[in-house]
């Protein structure tokens, strides 16, 4: 669900130019 990713981009937005990039990878938090 893209809506669920909306809450995950908080950590993904730390080092990425676009949250769409993490939609493909799966939010690499760490």
Swiss-Prot record:
One of its GO terms (biological process) is lipid catabolic process. Ca(2+) binds at residues 28, 30. Keywords: Calcium, Disulfide bond, Hydrolase, Lipid degradation, Lipid metabolism, Metal-binding, Myotoxin, Secreted, Toxin. GO terms for molecular function: calcium ion binding; phospholipase A2 activity; toxin activity. It is found in: Secreted. This is Phospholipase A2 acanmyotoxin-2. It comes from the Eukaryota. Binds 1 Ca(2+) ion. It catalyses: a 1,2-diacyl-sn-glycero-3-phosphocholine + H2O = a 1-acyl-sn-glycero-3-phosphocholine + a fatty acid + H(+). One of its GO terms (cellular component) is extracellular region. Belongs to the phospholipase A2 family. Group I subfamily. Snake venom phospholipase A2 (PLA2) that has myotoxic activity but no significant neurotoxicity. PLA2 catalyzes the calcium-dependent hydrolysis of the 2-acyl groups in 3-sn-phosphoglycerides. InterPro entries: PLipase_A2, PLipase_A2_dom_sf. Contains seven disulfide bonds. Expressed by the venom gland. Its EC number is 3.1.1.4. Its cofactor is Ca(2+).
């Amino acid at each position: 669900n893209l809506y669920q990713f909306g809450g995950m981009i908080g950590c993904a937005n730390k080092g990425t130019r676009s949250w769409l990039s993490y939609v493909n990878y799966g939010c690499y938090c760490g």
